[in-house]
């Protein structure tokens, strides 16, 4: 028997939902920093910059200080896309969830366990679907770090898929960042396929190698449900 239940969002959930959403996004910052550090262009820069300083000044101490500040800068840059995304959402769709989702032909669900909100997911119709398609987009899938491994994320995705079927949608689409490997594994296990990359026009995101990967699943096919 499941130790949680999935239900539609209610106004009393707002603070817990926002807290879970914010922490769920920001927890990816350390992984983003590690990902950025291992990029070939980052490794080259971390090698070349201190070497240039040593050759120009002869000071190894200055080179070490340079590496230290470069690492601090990279840590800051790696966190920016996630912090900016949270700030944007808190001022837009997450500011009034009822208006943004429940009153806009979409829906927002929470997973509840022990009287606490431990998971969230949302869905909205795609405004400009391809000709002949009726698409639903999945947003904000997140599960509390203390409640993972119980199948909650998969159950939330199934809820979106069932909603899409019931409402006559032909596809469910979503985007997730290259950093979120666990999410990508989950989506692919449930029948979603990668459809492309979304490279945003941002110098910071280019520097840290950040981009989004698009997924979709078409009905009637869907595994893991």
Swiss-Prot record:
Transmembrane segment boundaries: 29-49, 53-73, 202-222
Q: Which SUPFAM superfamilies match?
A: Acyl-CoA N-acyltransferases (Nat) (SSF55729)
A GO cellular-component term linked to this record: membrane
CDD domains (alphabetical): NAT_SF
Give the main EC class: transferase
Q: Which domain of life is it from?
A: Eukaryota
Q: Which residues form the N-acetyltransferase domain?
A: 69-213
> Could you list the residue ranges forming a coiled coil in this record?
none
Q: What keywords would UniProt list here?
A: Acyltransferase, Developmental protein, Gastrulation, Membrane, Transferase, Transmembrane, Transmembrane helix
The task this protein performs is described as: May play a role in regulation of gastrulation.
Protein name (database record) = Probable N-acetyltransferase family 8 member 5
Source organism of this protein record: Rattus norvegicus
- What would be the name of the gene that encodes this protein? Nat8f5
């Amino acid at each position: 028997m499941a130790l949680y239940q999935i239900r539609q969002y209610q106004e009393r959930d707002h603070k817990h939902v926002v807290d879970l959403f914010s922490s769920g996004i920001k927890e990816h910052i350390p992984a983003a920093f590690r990902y950025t550090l291992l990029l070939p262009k980052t490794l080259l820069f971390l090698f070349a910059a201190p070497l240039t300083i040593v050759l120009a000044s002869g000071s190894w101490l200055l080179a070490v200080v340079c590496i230290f500040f470069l690492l601090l800068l990279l840590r800051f840059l790696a966190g920016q896309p996630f912090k900016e995304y949270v700030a944007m959402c808190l001022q837009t769709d997450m500011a009034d969830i009822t208006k943004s989702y429940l009153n806009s032909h979409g829906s927002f669900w929470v997973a509840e366990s022990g009287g606490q909100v431990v998971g969230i997911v949302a869905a909205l119709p795609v405004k400009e679907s391809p000709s002949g398609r009726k698409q639903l987009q999945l947003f904000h899938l997140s599960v509390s770090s203390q409640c993972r491994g119980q199948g909650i994320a998969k159950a939330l995705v199934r809820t979106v898929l069932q909603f899409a079927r019931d409402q006559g949608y032909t596809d469910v689409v979503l985007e997730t960042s290259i950093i979120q490997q666990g999410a990508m594994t989950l989506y692919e296990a449930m029948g979603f396929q990668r459809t492309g990359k979304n490279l945003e026009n941002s110098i910071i995101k280019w520097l840290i190698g950040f981009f989004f990967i698009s997924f979709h699943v078409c009905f009637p096919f869907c595994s893991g449900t």
